[in-house]
């Protein structure tokens, strides 16, 4: 009985220490998503890979945000309709639901609003929302899937973008070595990695790079509009 009590006390103390580590660290654990509608997820996944949402019938969401390539296309800037080269680099889709806004300039408040943009962008999919909806409406299987997911086979652009956004929310990357270390697994990181993280904090990097994404939660001057000038001798 004493042994059982001792083990229980040790387990409680260990859990408390692990929970304290998570709460005290500026970078947080990426947790898997839960509670989403499975039918919307599967429909959104299909739409994610659907090239018929583009004018050329060749470009899908996955063309620029390839989930087999880290959620990007590994290009300086993406190639769109008629081989047009866009002006910006594609951000990764992984963990994107944790961003405080969408697009590099934050012009979309959430993933659903973001999903509507590329369809009508002349440099990307070069379609219209109405043509995209009409295309899906003409396909019996899609009408059936939308009926199952949304209770109606009358397809709307809002339902299209909602389904895509729902699928995107599943594209998280939990249980990285660092996440496991934050959860209390001391063997998940090497001694050098832990020392590097401590240096990262000591130098003040976490003032900007914090939260589950280790950053991406504020706007910064990047010199894209005009050269960034400062009198601060610290250029790091």
Regions found by a protein language model. Give the residues of each.
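N-terminal signal peptide c-region/cleavage motif recognized by signal peptidases
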Residues: 14-16
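Short alpha-helix boundary/capping motifs
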Residues: 72, 121, 139, 174-175, ...
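Periplasmic c-type cytochrome electron-transfer domains
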Residues: 81-169
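Short glycine/threonine-rich turn/loop motifs
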Residues: 20-117, 179-236
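Amphipathic alpha-helical substructures
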Residues: 144-200
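Bacterial N-terminal signal peptides
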Residues: 6-12
């Amino acid at each position: 009985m004493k042994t059982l009590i001792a083990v229980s006390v040790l387990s409680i103390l260990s859990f408390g220490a692990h929970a304290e580590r998570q709460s005290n660290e500026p970078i947080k654990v990426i947790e898997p998503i839960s509670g989403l509608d499975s039918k919307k997820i599967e429909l959104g996944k299909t739409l994610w890979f659907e090239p018929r949402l583009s004018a050329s019938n060749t470009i899908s969401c996955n063309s620029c945000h390839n989930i087999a390539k880290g959620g990007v296309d590994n290009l300086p800037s993406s190639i769109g309709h008629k081989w047009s080269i866009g002006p910006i680099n594609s951000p990764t889709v992984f963990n994107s639901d944790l961003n405080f806004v969408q697009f590099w300039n934050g012009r979309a408040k959430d993933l659903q609003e973001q999903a509507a943009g590329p369809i009508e962008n002349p440099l990307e999919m070069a379609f219209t929302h109405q043509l995209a909806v009409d295309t899906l409406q003409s396909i019996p299987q899609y009408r059936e899937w939308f009926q199952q997911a949304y209770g109606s086979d009358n397809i709307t652009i809002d339902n299209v973008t909602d389904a895509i956004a729902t699928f995107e929310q599943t594209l998280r990357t939990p249980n990285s070595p660092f996440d496991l270390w934050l959860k209390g697994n001391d063997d998940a990181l090497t001694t050098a990695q832990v020392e590097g993280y401590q240096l990262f904090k000591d130098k003040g990097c976490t003032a900007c790079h914090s939260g589950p994404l280790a950053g991406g939660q504020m706007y910064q001057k990047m010199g894209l509009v005009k050269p960034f000038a400062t009198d601060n001798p610290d250029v790091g």
